[in-house]
């Protein structure tokens, strides 16, 4: 089985499906936040197919860097200006965030920044996390 290198191609929010800015949307983590630097999940709304959407903590560097320096710098730059870097990797949407792990606060903030980027009304997005112990 060959391993393809990640692409992390940046995506313009205006190129995303319109329903992301029009419906009540829930982001659901598939396995919780303690899964490392990439948390897989999906955005869902009634009447629409789920859209795969992962959270990627871009600063993890062991045993090898998660992303090239240019991607890391861009993610930090966008975050510093109150936005989230939206990217694509092999057909999955990514919200690229600073840090080496995704915690609850970062997950909530990343989804809120996505909602603003697509013009969603305040309060129309929710985050569903499992409690694992």
Can you describe what each PLM-predicted range is?
Residues 1-44, 87-88:
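Charge-rich, low-complexity N-terminal segments
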Residues 3-6, 80-81, 119-133:
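Short, charged, intrinsically disordered terminal tails
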Residues 91-112, 123-133:
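Well-ordered alpha/beta subsegment
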Residues 53-94, 98, 106-107:
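Short, internal acidic amphipathic alpha-helical interface segments
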Residues 48-54, 102-117:
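Short, Lys/Arg-enriched charge-dense amphipathic segments
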Residues 35-61:
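Short, well-structured hydrophobic secondary-structure segments
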Residues 73-77, 110-121:
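Conserved short hydrophobic interaction patches
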């Amino acid at each position: 089985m060959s391993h393809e290198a990640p692409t992390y191609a940046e995506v313009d929010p205006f190129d995303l499906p319109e329903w992301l800015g029009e419906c009540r949307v829930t982001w659901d983590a598939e396995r919780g936040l303690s899964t490392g630097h990439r948390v897989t999940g999906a955005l869902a709304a009634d009447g629409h197919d789920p859209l795969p959407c992962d959270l990627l903590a871009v600063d993890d560097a062991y045993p090898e860097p998660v992303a090239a320096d240019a991607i890391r710098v861009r993610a930090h730059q966008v975050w510093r200006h109150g936005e989230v870097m939206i990217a694509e990797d092999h057909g999955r949407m990514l919200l690229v965030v600073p840090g080496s792990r995704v915690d609850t606060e970062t997950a909530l903030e990343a989804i809120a920044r996505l909602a603003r980027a697509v013009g969603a009304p305040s309060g129309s997005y929710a985050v569903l996390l499992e409690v694992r112990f």
